[in-house]
Amino acid sequence: MLKGKTALVTGSTSGIGLGLAKALAREGANIVLNGFGDVEGPKAELQALGVKVVYHGADMSKPSEIEAMMTFAAAQFGRVDVLVNNAGIQHVARLEDFPPEKWDAVIAINLSSAFHATRLALPAMKAANWGRIINVASVHGLVASPEKSAYVAAKHGLVGLTKVVALENATTGVTCNAICPGWVLTPLVQKQVDARALAGKISNDEATRQLLGEKEPSMQFTTPEELGELAVFFCSPAANNVRGVAWNMDGGWAAQ
């Protein structure tokens, strides 16, 4: 379905981003990877799916590096057809104790980076009259939790940005939608489970049950693969008129 097209996925060397990149690659999209840590492993996994893969290590908190990444992607493949704004970080603290520099970092990476990348991707998408912008928000783009002020503010902002971009391009072949996951078992979340087990002197299974039981009625993690299938749907002809949606895949979290 996406053969000959290019997908740029920010924060895609592991976790949700890598799952999304794999799903798009299985549909034939060439991939621009971005992120930190191991690059060669994810790159090889994607290349094994028969697509071209390149990497750019832009720091998503820096607009100049985002611009360099978008220029690089265009030089490699002509244009970005599918932009997935997935890069994100977290910091947890009560508001009065929240370090201002952490607030700025979360807003820069979780929200502003999507603005910068989208602004730069749109002209070529509009010229081609086809494009898909997929913002990875969170259930925290719909609801809130204590001690996550910056994250919740950024993800609510990302949902708002999604709607504006969708409306501004509603008569074109460019769509913009958001994915709002609940708990996803990524290496980052596994660390939270491990820490909870250690602190409570309980098993990892019990720590997992506690984590899910607090928020997610299904008592199941969403998987990166499931999120990837939703991204593929957004790219399909069936989703041509799906515009400005914040689609939660959260096991019933936001329904409560």
Where are these regions (language model features)?
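Active-site helix of classical SDR
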Residues: 118, 154, 162
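Short C-terminal tail/terminal secondary-structure segment
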Residues: 3, 143, 232, 243-256
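Substrate-binding pocket helix/loop in short-chain dehydrogenase/reductase
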Residues: 94-95, 102-107, 133, 212
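Conserved glycine-rich cofactor-binding loop
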Residues: 6, 13-15
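Short, small/polar-rich loop/turn modules that mediate ligand/substrate recognition or access, typified
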Residues: 170, 175, 242-244
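Residue(s) in the substrate-gating loop at a strand-loop-helix junction
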Residues: 138
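Conserved glycine-rich Rossmann-like NAD(P)H-binding loop of the short-chain dehydrogenase/reductase
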Residues: 27-42
